[in-house]
């Protein structure tokens, strides 16, 4: 399994609260004070952690699926008028957040 992380920063101060509300409309469960696991189209379960930025963590079976999952998540994150309101930074961290273990 490969850990994938998206750090989402706001270019508009209202963007992150609105984006988080939209993402939580998908089937989700709260797992911490500021954490939810949501099932997003094309990527499966994603850990959402809110704070001064929004962090999305997920696990992917094979490295070959990284571009497919990144494309699906970018499409989900940038839809609904968010294309110019957020900045995304992708990484593959060495550790997996506890709620995803």
Question: What annotation goes with each model-predicted range?
Answer:
Residues 29-64:
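Short, intrinsically disordered low-complexity segments
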Residues 64-96:
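C-terminal structural segments of small proteins and small subunits
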Residues 1-24:
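Short glycine-/aliphatic-rich beta-strand segments at the starts of folded cytosolic domains
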